[in-house]
Curated annotation (Swiss-Prot):
The lineage of its organism: Bacteria, Bacillati, Bacillota, Bacilli, Lactobacillales. InterPro entries: DUF2129. It is found in: Cytoplasm. This is UPF0298 protein SSU05_1549. GO terms for cellular component: cytoplasm. Keywords: Cytoplasm. The keyword Signal does not apply. Belongs to the UPF0298 family.
Length: 90
């Protein structure tokens, strides 16, 4: 049976676009912005902290920013999977 893995995204800012290929060993490259010189890399959640430390040591990397989407409150009006709260009106 298929088991869902927790994955997260890292935004890696580069000095040069030609170094984007080197990031494929760290995870799945989803998007590469050539104008703003960053790459979105998806990887398993348990590998993130070790990978951030490795990437910060690389000379071709300017900055590494993890995704904060899991920490945001996603319980808002219009969300299909939000917790149902009793209505005040009805």
């Amino acid at each position: 049976m298929f088991e869902k893995k927790n994955r997260t995204c890292l935004t890696v800012y580069l000095h040069y676009n030609r170094d984007a290929r080197k990031l494929s060993q760290y995870g799945d490259i989803v998007y590469h912005s050539k104008r703003l010189q960053y790459v979105l890399v998806y990887m398993d959640q348990e590998l993130v902290k070790a990978t951030i430390l490795k990437l910060k040591k690389e000379r071709f990397v300017k900055k590494v920013v993890p995704s904060y989407i899991k920490e945001l409150d996603q319980n808002f009006v219009g969300n299909l999977w939000r917790d149902e709260e009793p209505s005040v009106v009805g």
